[in-house]
Amino acid sequence: YYLSTKKIPVVYMQNSGIGNAINPLMSLTDKEVYNIPLLLLIGWRGEPSIKDEPQHIKQGKVTIPLLESMGIKYAIMSQSETELATQLQFAQDYMNTTKESFAFVIRKGTFDNYNFSQKNSADWCLSREAAIQIVASTLNKKDIIVSTTGMISRELFEYRETMCQGHERDFLTVGSMGHASQIALSIALQNRQKRIYCFDGDGSALMHMGSLAIIGTMHPNNYIHVIFNNGAHDSVGGQPTVGLNINFPKIAEGCGYEYVFSVSDKKSLCEILNRIDRKSVV
């Protein structure tokens, strides 16, 4: 955006995304490389002394030190409109003068609640939660599940609790978004005698799509990759993904998955689960 317009772009992220951003911030936009200014709006999960989920605690502690280590000037966004106006003017002047990035770290509760005018309104015949329950109910006692971050892991956990089942065969990837499929792959390669299921989401699959190529190339015959595609990041407000605009089955086929199925209703899902060739990557 900056290269084509010379206008300063705004990049919004949760602080868990800083890790993914470090490389381009240091090797591309930094003043010692191309000196491209960005206005970073960073949601502060896991702020010290503020109760949050376990996966956010460490990231919350190091959010400010990371910005300082990268040499990125920052401010904690004020909840006072007058003070915020001063902060914004300072940030604008700083970026225009130095061509360096500036970050606003945003505490929980800084903004009022907002109702989206448009929401993901797909008319699902089968909810994600119901689909998770159906697949989980077909597994035998030796099968292992690696579930992705967000609602999928939460709903799998709740299903186990409701059914009075243990959690010892489930690895809930509560953080590390996009990496569940590779965790499952490694487990599958080291445990050939067991079937390994990856319960993935469209958002996490999109985040690291190169993982599909690695899985297809490694071709473990005990790996079953299930992508629950609802076209939204449900656990962080329901923001839409492009999951409903692309063809996951074709992508999987192109990456070397031997058997690929797509279903959208309970009957079809049950039929496919009964047909799956357990000896091939799916």
Residue ranges of each PLM-predicted region?
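C-terminal binding/interaction regions
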Residues: 49, 63-65, 75
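Glycine/aspartate-rich loop-and-adjacent alpha/beta segment that forms the canonical ThDP
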Residues: 21-24, 28, 48, 100-141, ...
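Thiamine diphosphate
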Residues: 8, 35-41, 48-59, 158-282
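Cofactor- and metal-binding active-site motifs of prokaryotic enzymes
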Residues: 17-34, 51, 56
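Glycine-rich beta-alpha junction loops
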Residues: 45-46, 106-112, 149-153, 230-232
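Structural signature of the thiamine diphosphate
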Residues: 37, 68-69, 73-119, 249-282
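Active-site diphosphate/adenylate-binding microenvironment
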Residues: 115-177
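Short hydrophobic alpha-helices that are characteristic scaffold elements of the AMP-binding
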Residues: 3-4
